[in-house]
Amino acid sequence: MDTSGHFHDSGVGDLDEDPKCPCPSSGDEQQQQQQPPPPPAPPAVPQQPPGPLLQPQPPQPQQQQSQQQQQQQSQQQQQQAPLHPLPQLAQLQSQLVHPGLLHSSPTAFRAPTSANSTAILHPSSRQGSQLNLNDHLLGHSPSSTATSGPGGGSRHRQASPLVHRRDSNPFTEIAMSSCKYSGGVMKPLSRLSASRRNLIEAEPEGQPLQLFSPSNPPEIIISSREDNHAHQTLLHHPNATHNHQHAGTTAGSTTFPKANKRKNQNIGYKLGHRRALFEKRKRLSDYALIFGMFGIVVMVIETELSWGLYSKDSMFSLALKCLISLSTVILLGLIIAYHTREVQLFVIDNGADDWRIAMTYERILYISLEMLVCAIHPIPGEYKFFWTARLAFSYTPSRAEADVDIILSIPMFLRLYLIARVMLLHSKLFTDASSRSIGALNKINFNTRFVMKTLMTICPGTVLLVFSISLWIIAAWTVRVCERYHDQQDVTSNFLGAMWLISITFLSIGYGDMVPHTYCGKGVCLLTGIMGAGCTALVVAVVARKLELTKAEKHVHNFMMDTQLTKRIKNAAANVLRETWLIYKHTKLLKKIDHAKVRKHQRKFLQAIHQLRGVKMEQRKLSDQANTLVDLSKMQNVMYDLITELNDRSEDLEKQIGSLESKLEHLTASFNSLPLLIADTLRQQQQQLLTAFVEARGISVAVGTSHAPPSDSPIGISSTSFPTPYTSSSSC
């Protein structure tokens, strides 16, 4: 808070404050000492604020003189002593808090709108409408009442601006809670509503606002524009304010809840952290493959150079082996870092609290085996052992002194498993979020096996070619290294001869002209034969798949065959009709029957019939074959359309039945109300009949007494004058 009373970094919003605050900044101290005390402010014009107002209690007229005296005394003390906000902590903390504010909720700070109110709440330009808690506290405290002017203006604001601790002020707590999601120390949020859900989760529901009692006043932190950075530091380190407070004051000791900071991490942070771990794991896998391949290449170079150019005890061999050892150490470190990232991903995905939950026996065994495989490499130095073998054709024993580096060099090719891991982590199926979501819905595990299957489906020829050539070269070099100590004739120890041996073993031919002598070479040839059998089967499957027609090609082929068969059926039917006509012609129309021509046309007639039957049979087979080509998805779509149509019809039928039911109910209600209508109609007609009868009787009596002769009716009315339902118009 600066001298104008505005919150700059608390994230709460801008609060209007009277510029006549008795706590100026350090740069305005001399001007405040020279200027005389300001006159009392005129009564403020009442405004209609956009938000609720806080109306303090107006001071009594008897207290105005004492208030002015206290104001003059405070101004004289400020002119005599150096104006700094820190020495006023004891005075500000000794002020009593209004007892109505204790154990109240945040909604209790709102007061009804009044024209005499001076603490007007207005919506802030940054964070919306916020509550000026300091004005409310000063307005309800005795000091604010004592400093109020006679006009009821803004004199109660002349107390020094204060900021409550985060635990005592709910709005400061909201701002501080929003800062931990925005990432700044006291950085205000541009969108406070974006973190409203997190703030609701962070604050306990139903907990009222707990203010400090007068015996234990809240810790007050005063800052100016120049002390903004120090104010931010004090807010995050509340214990540091004890060094600047008065000796007789005591501050409430409350700390920020560190447990909520971990629990209230939103899902966006977890997803971002998970994505970063994915990228780090992919980079670590790439670096591990690079250093693993580098070690293999240096090992091959050192083995070839030490066999033909220099010995194992030379400096060149020692330098190359040291380079291999260095690359191996780096590789082991990268593998450990890779598995560390995997454990972190497991913790994030499963919401575990402890990383030791992910360390199962299977994972520990897998990591140990991987470390053991990658740790094997030639040790710097010269180490020998005696190797005994039996020659192939002569069966004579052969004993030679070999290097230990052979045993440690050949297993280094096991590091090539890192290629499969890199292919998995760089695959679009593994990195794409949409494919992973669809795979998760279909319960598909995205592993190396799935990636290899997709590669074999997309480009089977390329995969088989690369795998076969790589296996051929590695197996040939391994056989050459294994056979070099026991091959006096330089047959299998030659690289070209070893490639010939591996090729005939890979293709399962086995001429027998070249055979390995050592168990090392025999084991390599055995593995090569097994892999060759598998690759041969894959080649046959790939070739058969390439030669097979696709569904579109099959549909086109069936359409063309059906067209040709239709033409053949027409031709066969025409031949049958032609031969039938010719037989009839030669037997019935001609005078002289030629039996040779008749037999000829009969023979052609039978051939045409058999041809027609054969073509029809081929057409039936083609139609059966075409029916088997109907896709399941197409059938499913057809069934879906039929079911949809049936559902629509059933809905229409239900609507019609509903309308019929409503009409039937209406008719039932009409029939039920019909007796009442008939009764009402009869009652009305009876009333009309009685009325007409009375009127007719009165008229007839009047006429009979004056002019008409007496009638034969006993009541004195003629039958013609008596209205009946059949003669009276009113009866209708």
UniProtKB/Swiss-Prot annotation:
Disulphide bond pairs: none
Q: Where is this region: Calmodulin-binding?
A: 562-638
Reactions catalysed according to its record? K(+)(in) = K(+)(out)
Molecular function terms in GO for this entry? calmodulin binding; inward rectifier potassium channel activity; small conductance calcium-activated potassium channel activity
Sequence ranges of Polar residues compositional bias: 119-133, 241-257
Major place of residence:
membrane
Q: How is its activity regulated?
A: Inhibited by bee venom neurotoxin apamin.
Question: Highest taxon of the source?
Answer: Eukaryota
Which residues are recorded with the post-translational modification Phosphoserine? Answer: S168
List all Low complexity biased stretches.
Answer: 62-82, 139-148, 718-732
- InterPro entries tied to this protein: CaM-bd_dom, CaM-bd_dom_sf, K_chnl_Ca-activ_SK, K_chnl_dom
Q: Which spans are intramembrane here?
A: 495-515
Task: Give the Basic and acidic residues compositional bias ranges.
Answer: 1-11
Q: Where is this region: Disordered?
A: 1-82, 119-161, 241-260, 704-732
Query: Which SMART domains does this chain map to?
Result: CaMBD
Output the Gene Ontology cellular-component terms.
Answer: cytoplasm; plasma membrane; Z disc
Q: Does the keyword Coiled coil apply?
A: yes
Q: How does it sit in the membrane?
A: Multi-pass membrane protein
Tissue expression notes: Expressed at low levels in atrial and ventricular myocytes (at protein level).
The protein's role, per its UniProt record: Small conductance calcium-activated potassium channel that mediates the voltage-independent transmembrane transfer of potassium across the cell membrane through a constitutive interaction with calmodulin which binds the intracellular calcium allowing its opening. The current is characterized by a voltage-independent activation, an intracellular calcium concentration increase-dependent activation and a single-channel conductance of 10 picosiemens.
Q: Which PANTHER family match?
A: SMALL CONDUCTANCE CALCIUM-ACTIVATED POTASSIUM CHANNEL
| Record protein name field | Small conductance calcium-activated potassium channel protein 3
